[in-house]
Amino acid sequence: MPHGAEREASPAEESAGTRPLTGEEYLESLRDAREVYLDGSRVKDVTAHPAFHNPARMTARLYDSLHDPAQKAVLTAPTDAGDGFTHRFFTAPRSVDDLVKDQAAIASWARKSYGWMGRSPDYKASFLGTLGANADFYEPFADNARRWYRESQEKVLYWNHAFLHPPVDRSLPADEVGDVFIHVERETDAGLVVSGAKVVATGSALTHAAFISHWGLPIKDRKFALVATVPMDADGLKVICRPSYSANAATTGSPFDNPLSSRLDENDAILVLDQVLIPWENVFVYGNLGKVHLLAGQSGMIERATFHGCTRLAVKLEFIAGLLAKALDITGAKDFRGVQTRLGEVLAWRNLFWSLSDAAARNPVPWKNGTLLPNPQAGMAYRWFMQIGYPRVLEIVQQDVASGLMYVNSSTEDFRNPETGPYLEKYLRGSDGAGAVERVKVMKLLWDAVGSDFGGRHELYERNYSGNHENTRIELLLSQTASGKLDSYMDFAQACMDEYDLDGWTAPDLESFHAMRSASRDLLGGL
């Protein structure tokens, strides 16, 4: 278990079984020796720094909800590796009902961030929740898989992942960029000494551990064949963050001016491993060139991650649809027919992603040891549709709200200034008696969602996090080719073609009307 996530159970807790961390325990677990760097300095305490304080509290809300009697029925289930309770998605589903309840738990947590936390703790449960049923895949490290399945359930541990190699030269295989890509430098009795870098470690500063793996083109050198987890406070692990939207909001704005970015920034980072010792008990795959390439296809992680992502995006689109409707209302544009058609389109995208999430839950495929996976075809359809659907929704917002997104004052202080406040109340008011503050509040929230640095980052995320725009299409083709479905579609088309030829219908119950056509030709030939 990551050092920072340890806690002692009281006698009452021990008799009652294990339980997830509370929000305060989660925050305390982050106060360790992790090396997080931002703006040229090491962050001493991520729970107190303006870049991470509010995002950490938004995550703490999730942990606290697991202990709320009013929410436990939706969010939690008994652990299947012990005698406590956990977030439902950390367990392996064995029925359609389990998956439908998993969907509800994912959606419930997503609503607490209005759909804007793509990497909440349950996201990596897409992997952790497979480790019990699929432990044998990780031989000779199967016991590690079973232990992490149990421990992640018991505490609802928060993992990030970093699979991608730094794109220093995408034309070269990993073996030829060995000084950059994660690789094992040496083996010791205590574990593997590892160096290199991984991207993009979204939200990693506020997690308990990093999950690293080779991902991409085949490799030839076993030192790159590594799948493992690293505690965030491991010696030699460094987190180098991108600019913080939360810190910028705290410095130059306010919650009113930056209502999303000031509390929901999942900071993306570079993970640097400099001679990091990874204990053997934290290794899942090492040195097996074949197995490391099978991880995506045989771990069950992709099917579960797309199920989680599709459900979260459906929630997010409900938020955007509601906010867009408020913006159209407050600008007096809601009754224009063209505007109504495009709001209807946004609702159609919302319905599409909920339908794909429902299809994934209600049409699962059998998997290992009596467990089920969400339907992979629904998941692959989601991965493609999100790449065109989310940008289209943003385009509609920009098209129909238009300059209203920029027709705002710079700061809340403008309303308090007696020289500008009265003018703003007069010239920035909304329709149907809405005051200027109400109108600007809507527009600033919408701008943060679609036009700010935070909003732009989210568009990039939704477009790319589940695969590049070509792979999502190719993988659909390869999947349906391998399963024989594409052949069956071709056979279906051929069945139609087999019912006719140059001489007419070959089906005995259909009439080709040869005599009628012959008479018609004779008639036309006489003209």
Swiss-Prot record:
GO molecular-function term, one example from the UniProt record: monooxygenase activity
Keyword Metal-binding carried by entry: no
Activity modulation notes: The SgcE6-SgcC hydroxylation activity decreases in the presence of excess FAD.
Residues reported in the UniProt entry to bind FAD: 161-163, 167-170, 202
Subunit structure: Homotetramer.
Region Disordered: start-end pairs: 1-22
Keywords carried by this UniProt record: Antibiotic biosynthesis, FAD, Flavoprotein, Monooxygenase, Oxidoreductase
Record-listed E.C. numbers: 1.14.14.15
Functional description taken from the UniProt entry: Can also efficiently catalyze the regioselective hydroxylation of other 3-substituted beta-tyrosyl-S-SgcC2 analogs, including the bromo-, iodo-, fluoro-, and methyl-substituted analogs, but does not accept 3-hydroxy-beta-tyrosyl-S-SgcC2 as a substrate. Is only active with SgcC2 (peptidyl carrier protein)-tethered substrates.
Reaction equation(s) it catalyzes: (3S)-3-amino-3-(3-chloro-4-hydroxyphenyl)propanoyl-[SgcC2 peptidyl-carrier protein] + FADH2 + O2 = (3S)-3-amino-3-(3-chloro-4,5-dihydroxyphenyl)propanoyl-[SgcC2 peptidyl-carrier protein] + FAD + H2O + H(+)
Name the record gives this protein: (3S)-3-amino-3-(3-chloro-4-hydroxyphenyl)propanoyl-[peptidyl-carrier protein SgcC2] monooxygenase
Family affiliation: Belongs to the FADH(2)-utilizing monooxygenase family.
Biased composition (Basic and acidic residues): 1-10
Pathway of action: Antibiotic biosynthesis
Pfam family, one: HpaB
Tree of life domain: Bacteria
One record GO biological process: antibiotic biosynthetic process
pH-activity profile: Optimum pH is 6.0.
